[in-house]
Regions:
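Active-site catalytic motif of lipid deacylating hydrolases and related acyltransferases
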Residues: 12-67
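Gly/Ala-rich beta-loop-alpha elbow adjacent to hydrolase catalytic centers
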Residues: 74-84
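Aromatic pocket-lining residues of Rossmann-like dinucleotide-binding sites
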Residues: 86-87, 241
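The alpha/beta-hydrolase serine catalytic core
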Residues: 90-199
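Asp-based phosphoryl-transfer active-site loop
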Residues: 210-227
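Short, acidic loop-to-helix structural element flanking the phosphoryl-transfer center
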Residues: 225-249
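Substrate-recognition "cap/lid" segment bordering the active-site pocket of phosphatases
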Residues: 250-268
């Protein structure tokens, strides 16, 4: 039975197209794509099945982008690696696997592998060989080739702070300034989508539409309890405000204690 109380974002990406690019051994039928459709009922979410060979996958994606002219592309893991190279469109790379060859071998994904989701072509198994790994290594050498100031504005990176598989935050940050850590692992679960991905999508949608939200400033001292721990109401209040306002936190910035600023940023 459908959950009538599930929060959605009917005012987000209205009439726009989003391409979702799945990860390794996944498919367009992934639950992640359906979550995005549920959250943004006024948007069209396109989620293709990718060929296992990276050159074929990249060709499919480029043709799809040319045909559909999406307003936003979201890619996770392997899909995040492909997404980075789809220049000219606003993009979000979630836990992008920019070192796919090493990721496959280090994560014991060689040999016979089973797709995690149903593919339209009916294929459910594949043999991952050394030759295929080399194809991925060759593909990742093309990442970051066309980064310029405009692309840096278009691209966001989201990185789980407990991701045991992909560790590319520093590599991404060498090329793109909009890199964000979130509380989560490698797999993009619904909690991470709701709390971390949706606010970035909202920011991109606002920018595309030229919307200026009113600003709310919150003193950091109001966020903590008597023991310096975040108040239990903090997260919920922040998300409620974020639906309608640009929210900023105000913290002291002592010039003689530069480390204090980093500590406060980490706490928030």
């Amino acid at each position: 039975m459908e959950n009538q109380y599930k929060k959605t974002f009917p005012d987000l990406m209205v009439g726009k197209k989003i391409i979702y690019v799945h990860g390794f051994m996944s498919a367009g039928s992934t639950h992640t794509a359906q979550i995005l459709r549920d959250y943004m009922p006024q948007a069209t979410v396109i989620a293709p099945d990718l060929p296992i060979h990276p050159e074929e996958a990249m060709a499919l994606l480029r043709n799809l982008v040319d045909a559909e002219q999406p307003d936003l592309i979201i890619g996770t893991s392997m899909g995040g690696m492909y997404t980075e190279m789809l220049y000219g469109t606003d993009r979000i790379c979630v836990n992008p696997a920019f070192q796919m060859g090493a990721t496959i071998t280090e994560s014991n994904m060689m040999g016979k592998q089973v797709f995690q989701n149903v593919r339209q072509d009916g294929i459910q198994e594949v043999i991952v060989t050394k030759a295929l790994v080399k194809e991925y290594k060759d593909m990742t050498e093309n990442c970051f080739k066309q980064v310029d100031a405009k692309e840096q504005e278009r691209v966001f990176g989201l990185f789980g702070d407990a991701d045991p598989i992909v560790h590319t935050f520093d590599l991404f940050s060498e090329h793109y300034p909009q890199a964000i850590h979130f509380h989560g692992e490698h797999r993009l679960i619904e909690k991470a989508i709701f709390h971390y991905l949706m606010p970035v999508i909202r920011w991109i949608d606002d920018r595309q539409e030229g919307r200026e939200r009113r600003t709310v400033l919150i003193d950091k001292d109001t966020l903590a309890d008597a023991y310096g721990k975040p108040k239990s109401s903090l997260h919920k209040a922040y998300e409620l405000l974020l639906d309608n306002y640009n929210v900023y936190f105000v913290c002291p910035a002592p010039t003689n204690q530069p480390s204090a600023i980093s500590e406060q940023q980490a706490w928030i």
